[in-house]
Amino acid sequence: MTYCVGIKAQDGIVFASDSRTTAGLDNVNIYSKMFVHDVGDRSVIIVTSGNLGTSQAVYKSIENDLKSDSGTNLNTCKDFDQIASYIGSLNIKNSAPKGINTDTVLLGSSFLVGGQIKGQPLELYLVYSQGNYIKPAVSKPYLVIGEVKYGKPILDRVIKPSVSIGDASRCALISMDSTLKSDLTVGPPIDFAVYKKDEYKIASQKCLNITDTEYSKVCDQWSDSIFKIFDSFPRFDWEDNK
């Protein structure tokens, strides 16, 4: 399994995805689940969760379409709605190869895609395995896929329409760290990408281990703060106050 988060802030977009893939306790591998297209008038970031074979096939199809420079590709799509539709069609095509009984075998993947095309607003979409897609709620401008239950609470508390890209970045790392601590199927290194509004190039793209300073400073301080606040809570009247 995996965990991916995308956050649309006022001044940019943040993506984070883990890179652990498991096929049983004795078969754990590392694969990047992030795809970045940063050319000309647009920046597009994609992360994926689900069947690894399908996800890699979709990414390969995107690369091949860009090389052929004909038909539909990330450069010819007029807006992110078309990009989401394009990824959805590739997802359907690659999740049901010939000879596979789709009634008994689940080969679907889901994708988060976001960024900006020049002259258009920041966009963020979730593309489902069935090919359809959604945008985040205006009141909660983030989307998550994969093992979402551990990293979602901090997002619900912190991420608002007014959130800055810096706070969104810190929240994304804390959300990822919360998931790593509770789910063994999610693991480092963490692919982390930041896009700033109207720049049309990636501001930062890194592969972070939990010992890297940029990651550990935020997550260690968060953990320490939780312990300090918890220890300061008022005591119940039935507790021994000695």
What positions do the PLM features span?
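N-terminal nucleophile
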Residues: M1-K242
